[in-house]
Amino acid sequence: VVGAGGWWDRPRGVAVTGGWRTVCALRADGYNIVSVPRRGYHLKPPENAVWPSCIRAHLKAKWIAQRIDYYDATGSTNRIARALGSEDASAAPHGTLVIADEQESGRGRMTRSWISKKGDAVLMSLLLRPQNTAPDEAAVLVQVTALAVCEACRSLGAPALIKWPNDIVADGLKLCGILLE
């Protein structure tokens, strides 16, 4: 069990030797686990890691990413979010975040498709369940989202601009696209 800050907590009832075997198995799978005398084991996320616990730890929002579905690889985070959206709201609440390291059949506007290899992009879809919003009002969400993403990129030093209608670019390179369905 990985606790706060990446420190490993041995579950109750698991012997120290059982915990050591688990650490060895995780290291063999490529996880960077550091032994710290008298403290325990610390799981160090790889650079540019997209781990739900890392995302949740750095978010200040109250409702975004209370549930995070993470995939090493998927066809489309959007397709998964749409399927979750058809479920009961208690199973997939407003703000559910779907993220992946790799995507084989991403979709954009006008049914454009694209592939993203591991490490090429941040791939995510956010499930929103707006209350009392007419379909024609929902289109405003694209512009509001574009403004928010653009401002976030600028706060990190990127000279981000909105390329109408749904892309964020910086220095001529696309940073992200926003798809609302």
List PLM regions with ranges.
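Short beta-strand elements
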Residues: 180-181
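N-terminal lobe of the biotin/lipoate ligase/transferase fold
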Residues: 5-8, 12-13, 17-151, 155, ...
